[in-house]
A protein has these predicted regions:
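Glycine-rich loops and low-complexity Gly/Arg-rich segments
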Residues: 145-149, 234-235, 301-305
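Amphipathic alpha-helical segments that form well-ordered structural scaffolds
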Residues: 78-82, 249, 253, 257
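Long, well-structured alpha-helical subdomains associated
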Residues: 7-18, 22, 30-31, 37, ...
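Peri-catalytic and regulatory segments of divalent metal-dependent proteins
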Residues: 17-207, 219-222
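Catalytic Zn2+-binding segment of zinc metalloproteases
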Residues: 206, 211-229, 256-262
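Post-HEXXH active-site segment of zinc metalloproteases
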Residues: 219-248
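Long, charge-dense tracts
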Residues: 1-5
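Acidic, metal/cofactor-coordinating or nucleic-acid-engaging core segments within structured domains
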Residues: 189-192, 196, 200, 209, ...
């Protein structure tokens, strides 16, 4: 009997634009003569990844086992390190493929008997948007630590610029081109409190998104026969729609996976899943309404907030206040009369 191919081969062979090493692919695609700044920056990133891999993976450098994206591979390794014994072997069957396609999309691919492993595909725009919303919210959270109102007000133009990039990728491309042409570097201190907040939100946001898709696989939502809805992941009295229940269960699985990996209390890790939903809601004019396959963003947000409240009610209350304030600011920044028809987060 012929050995089955693994999910990695399924991705590279089956998806247009699928490559074995995403970061190296980006670096090789840039002509140094045409864009020396970007070329040097991408090569620097590869070198930093090599050094990081040598430090944490016994000198194995950029060796990747669970994704074609170095950062995502590192996140899966984190999951494995912090997982209960019964999850470790399952997590080692995950493979995440990054694609350079437009669209805020990540998907657990249905199982195929011809291949081993669990395949997840992610579009680059999803990771980019998690980065942008993390930066945006980090300005607000950092501002909460500043006593001077005048200094806090200075942060809003930065937030407005990031919001523009979330809704207008042409504006982001224009900015990136200007930076490349002028060899501009971000002068913000890499050890600044705001950047630390943004980094924590970004990492936890990515873990939540990956954990959600891993949940779809582990709860058997991607299999053609049988389901394995673990009752603790299904919220009570929410809906009888099976597809909606799948989404709630995957959200809860992802949050539990995130919390189980926390070595110490970190409120930003718990805020991150909420702001991922806020980012996705920007592309939905009616976040209070469900569609055929997904519950409303309002219900998903309130479900996660309830789960955080079970973990720590005081923390949940603080995160709710942050979410309310940022969502309100986004709503009226995008339109004086309100971007969304309702204040769905309240």
């Amino acid at each position: 009997m012929e050995d089955k191919k693994f999910a990695k081969e399924r991705f590279i062979d089956g998806f247009l634009g699928g490559v074995e090493d995403w970061d190296n692919h980006l670096a090789e695609a840039i002509n140094k003569d045409e864009n020396p700044y970007l070329k040097d920056k991408l090569l620097k990133i590869l070198k930093e990844q090599e050094d990081f891999g040598n430090a944490i993976n016994s000198g194995l450098g950029r060796e990747m086992w669970y994704s074609n994206d170095f950062f995502i591979n590192s996140l899966i390794l984190d999951f494995i390190t912090g997982a209960e014994d019964d999850l470790v072997n399952e997590l080692k069957q995950i493979w995440v493929g990054m694609l350079g396609k437009p669209g805020v999309n990540v998907e657990a691919i249905n199982m195929n008997d011809e291949f081993e492993g669990y395949l997840i595909k992610m579009h680059f725009e999803m990771e980019l948007n998690i980065h942008l919303i993390s930066d945006l919210v980090a300005y607000y959270v950092y501002g909460m630590q500043i006593s001077s109102e005048r200094e806090r007000v200075k942060l809003f133009p930065e937030m407005a610029e990031l919001l523009l990039y979330l809704i207008d990728k042409k504006a982001l491309l224009k900015k990136a081109t200007e930076v490349a042409q002028n060899d501009q570097e971000n002068q913000e201190d890499h050890n600044s409190p705001r950047l630390n907040i943004a980094s924590e939100l970004y990492e936890a946001g990515m873990k939540f998104v990956l954990g959600h898709e891993i949940g779809h696989h582990f709860l058997k939502h991607t299999e053609s026969t049988g389901r394995n809805i673990v009752s603790k992941f299904v919220p009570a009295d929410v809906t009888s729609n099976q597809l909606h229940l799948d989404e709630f269960a995957a959200d809860n699985f992802a949050l539990d996976l995130l919390i189980s990996g926390m070595k110490e209390r970190n409120d930003n890790n718990l805020l991150a899943p909420l702001i991922v939903l806020l980012m996705l809601a920007i592309y939905d004019k009616t976040p209070e309404e469900p569609n055929q396959s997904h519950p409303s963003f309002r219900d998903r947000y309130l479900n996660l907030l309830s789960r955080v409240s079970e973990h720590d009610e005081k923390v949940a209350s603080g995160l709710q206040q942050i979410f309310n304030n940022v969502a309100t600011w986004i709503n009226y920044s995008l339109s004086e009369s309100g971007y969304w028809k309702t204040e769905w987060w309240k």
